[in-house]
Curated annotation (Swiss-Prot):
SUPFAM superfamilies: EF-G C-terminal domain-like (SSF54980), P-loop containing nucleoside triphosphate hydrolases (SSF52540)
Binding residues for GTP: 14-19, 131-134
A Gene Ontology biological process term: positive regulation of translation
Protein known as: Elongation factor 4
Subcellular location per the Swiss-Prot or TrEMBL entry: Cell inner membrane
Catalytic activity: GTP + H2O = GDP + phosphate + H(+)
Amino acid sequence: MKNIRNFSIIAHIDHGKSTLSDRFIQVCNGLSEREMKEQVLDSMDIERERGITIKAQSVTLDYTARDGQTYQLNFIDTPGHVDFSYEVSRSLAACEGALLVVDAAQGVEAQTVANCYTAIEQNLEVIPILNKIDLPSAEPDRVAQEIEKIIGIDATGATTCSAKIGIGVEDVLETIVAKVPAPEGDVNAKLQALIIDSWFDNYLGVVSLVRVKNGTIKKGEKFKVMSTGVAYQVDRLGVFTPKMKDLDHLKAGEVGFIVAGIKDIHGAPVGDTLTHAHNPTDKPVPGFKKVQPQVYAGMFTISSDDYPDFREALEKLSLNDASLFFEPEVSQALGFGFRCGFLGMLHMEIIQERLEREYNLDLITSAPTVVYKAIKKDGEIIEVDNLSKLPEPGAIAEIQEPIVRANILVPKDYVGSVITICIEKRGVQVDLNYVGNQVSITYDLPMIEVVSDFFDTLKSVTKGYGSLDYELIRYEPANMVCLDVLINGDKVDALASIVHKDQAKYKGRELVERLKELIPRQMFEVAIQAAIGGTIVARSTVKALRKNVLAKCYGGDVSRKKKLLEKQKEGKKRMKNIGSVEIPQEAFLSVLKK
């Protein structure tokens, strides 16, 4: 056991984490030259296209160090984006050490700081590594100082490397062997194994990635899942090198996969503990905090025939992504679908993209909202993640909205523009610190403002250098109202939203004008209105198409023409009363995308 090293890499998007892991695999001959491709561990197409890591992956490599001993390195890859911080905390729970990889040209970013604190809280040994030192703009000394000032860990003599051209990779591996502590645990004790991740394979059933804390698990043995008490038999177990490599057993300190023919998707929940069926342990391994969805949206299939496939796809995805929440929902405008909870907007986009690609579904998503608290006059508190749960306006004493503490790191040239967008988003400044070239700005912001398009705006005003990390801190009363959209007097539930009263008129006008362009002209007039309760705050009209009924009259008497026009008017009136407006799918999509 003393030769096992479990570690993960903490790094911001684009700081070279996936490339460094490719080099580890090459140096340790994990894959043959023919099988190597860039970003081996980013197995999803979306991960490669967007250049981000979404799912945690694991690799076991054998490395012969300079002291002549062979070490087993269990490396767990982690995502860098703020929406996937839960994946990070899961990966860290299985490690004794973490490499903090920082781009020597760009410096420390906000998410790296947040993930680094998670690692320190879990008592991991954090080792700073400066990557990309081959770049002409690299300033390793400045960045090392930044690491010390912002994060507070000693970065003097930090290992430097360039994963792209392969310099210093062996030094990094030597540093891991020297500094990451060996795992603790007893091979002969009762079995305790923590499930770090599970996913559904169409041939094997549920595949679980586990970290064995104590004891040994062998092929053919029976184990049980502690939260459900159900027992299964091990069909296959082994490690990823990144390919699946079968072994006879996994012992304390190791990280590997277990396949037990579990067909029920919820059979092996992430964060659970496995133990022997015949000689179980009393206490589970302390898992990690259950994560609460922050953003909710309705998802509907464009054709109602896909509904059963949609449900199955969500169930399979939720096994692999423990932070996805869903429940059935019906909308008058969009039909049957699910109300889904996500960690943030990127998470929502990725889930929608995965559903559309991997399961061939055509989906439409309603406007995202966060969880508000409505306090009724009789003191009852209702959590509102869906507008249909909002009580009547007369019964509400106050609405409270979630406030997040946002920590923004930007180069000092952009401070002014960042403060401006924070003020526009109703933010309150908490702190501002200059650290070398970077400025750390802390703001309390309403969560709805952060999840809608704050990240994109921040990136554009800071030319891509700004980074953001946020956490929910409290709820506070806010002047929120429900903005309804009426088309010919009928409410369209899919377009309703909760907005701040000060912005209601502006948002209403914007929405109405946008719909006016998107709804095709009908044979009768279509009135589009935005309303708060009974008050109309904006209105627009799609003019009617009309046939020229006087075309056949040529000359003739004026009273004859009048009669025809009156008749047309009557017909239009009747049509307006009984005609319904077809709103094209594009209109919904365009309005909801904003």
